[in-house]
Amino acid sequence: MGLEIVVKDIQEGASAEVSRIKAEGDAKASEIINEAKEVQKKTLGDSLAKAEEDLQNLHQQVISSANLEVKRITLNKRKDLLDKVYVQTVEKIKSMPASKKEELLKNILSKYEASGARVYSSKDSEDIVKKLTSLSYAGNLDAIGGIVLENEDGTVRLDFTYDSILKNVYERSLKQISDLLYG
């Protein structure tokens, strides 16, 4: 019977060892599962945070693109309007009464005549310019109106043609619009 007691002791010892190993295994498995859950939560949280950040960035890009498109459309509309005003102004200048043309030329010549020795004008304004100034008439220009003054040796030309004045106003207006829209 001594052998049965020894076998029983060995079985009880083995059973206790199996229970201990099983308990350690369960504890380790539970620990690994908990760690995996924590890693999963952190990964999910990081993924959600990244997705939110990406969504916010995309939202900002869409808003910026929309604002830029609105500015571009606005600039184009204003440019179209300036183009129309430019064409209308040219037509108004061309159809201006002779008395008004003479008055404008007289104002330009009274202010700037001393700066030149020769004067150029459009063919339409030639007779008026010759009447208003004692400067040497040097010829005709392809312009809608106004004059160009030139010094004695031809090195300096002052352009007071309406074409030039309109072009300068037009370009300044475009620059102002662009500055307003794009800072």
Curated annotation (Swiss-Prot):
InterPro entries: ATPase_E_C (IPR038495), ATPase_V1_Esu (IPR002842). GO terms for biological process: proton motive force-driven plasma membrane ATP synthesis. The keyword Cell inner membrane does not apply. One of its GO terms (molecular function) is ATP binding. Keywords: ATP synthesis, Cell membrane, Hydrogen ion transport, Ion transport, Membrane, Transport. It is a peripheral membrane protein. It is found in: Cell membrane. Gene3D superfamilies: ATP synthase, E subunit, C-terminal (3.30.2320.30). Its main location: membrane. One of its GO terms (cellular component) is plasma membrane. HAMAP family: ATP_synth_E_arch. Component of the A-type ATP synthase that produces ATP from ADP in the presence of a proton gradient across the membrane. Belongs to the V-ATPase E subunit family. Has multiple subunits with at least A(3), B(3), C, D, E, F, H, I and proteolipid K(x). This is A-type ATP synthase subunit E. It comes from Methanosarcina barkeri (strain Fusaro / DSM 804). The lineage of its organism: Archaea, Methanobacteriati, Methanobacteriota, Stenosarchaea group, Methanomicrobia.
